[in-house]
Amino acid sequence: MRISGFLNYIHMEIKNRQIKIGNSKWKIKLEESMLSEDKESFYFGMSNATYKKIKLSTKLPDNTKVNNDSLQETYYHEILHSILSEGQYKEESDNEPLVEWIAKCLLQLKKQNAL
């Protein structure tokens, strides 16, 4: 899939989709905007290993769309959290710099058609 079509792919193919990671089915859901309960923090994405759910934000707090690169990177980022959690690498899943770095590298490789 070309990167330029990824945003449409996310909206058409990922919305309310299930994926299998290891032996578990994970649900992926798109949210317009994800703010903390106190409205002080914004999340581009979130994964929940207990409920096997991944959420991706499609809009920023100011209601503008999340740009394509950020959405792609967040998708990879949250999938990596899920992969590590399923593989019983909880400590590594909680390592945000590691997950962020691998997500950025995977996206870069994807853009080079190396994946």
Where are these predicted regions, by residue range?
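Phenylalanine-focused residue identity feature
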Residues: 6, 42-44, 75
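Active-site scaffold of zinc-dependent metalloenzymes
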Residues: 15-69, 82-86, 90-105
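Short, Lys/Arg-rich amphipathic alpha-helical interaction segments
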Residues: 111-115
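N-terminal amphipathic/basic-hydrophobic helices that include classical n-h-c signal peptides
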Residues: 1-11
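Short alpha-helical catalytic segment bearing the HExxH-like zincin motif
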Residues: 70-78
